[in-house]
């Protein structure tokens, strides 16, 4: 968020990728939306569309879930390329164009996308143009033996539920705080050597 980039999280289902992003939205107090990418998801389901209002006899814009500050594109590689491409303008320009009108998105803006490994059934490879828009990719693997044993014990003794409660998390900052951090990061000098 401070660097202004987007993140791709990769791992098999069930490792907590979605919970991680929901938790991030909570502690940063950002507007948060989640889109579950599926094979039948259409581009307008992501960005929104113009809708005719019979009462006013005019078109009105129905904003899609991409109109937010923190967007979770869950299992992005389960949707066909046409739907994945709906995020290209969102990620690069931080705007959405509907019926020729451009809508600027609120800052800070970040897409956190999860994807399943390509060897999983029902997945599509992300196009190069989309991969280029991610600042980095994080690989999430199965927990080690000790961590998995600890998780099993938490399930058995009932303490796991409290650990998974996103609503119990306290905000650490907000959009203004993030914007201030971003401004400070612009002043960091990087040695050419």
Please tell me what each predicted stretch does.
Residues 2-38:
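Walker A/P-loop
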Residues 67-92, 121-130, 142-151:
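Conserved AAA+/SF3 P-loop NTPase catalytic/coupling segment centered on the Walker-B
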Residues 12, 46, 114:
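P-loop (Walker A) phosphate-binding loop of NTP-binding proteins
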Residues 159-193:
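Basic, amphipathic alpha-helical bundle interface domains used for macromolecular binding and assembly
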Residues 27-55:
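AAA+/P-loop NTPase substrate/partner-engagement loops
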Residues 30, 124-141, 159-162:
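A short helix-turn-beta junction within AAA+ P-loop NTPase domains corresponding to the substrate/partner-engaging
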Residues 60-69, 98-115, 126-135:
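AAA+/SF3 P-loop NTPase mechanochemical coupling elements
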Residues 36-41, 136-147, 167-169:
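Conserved AAA+ ATPase "SRH/arginine-finger" region at the nucleotide-binding site
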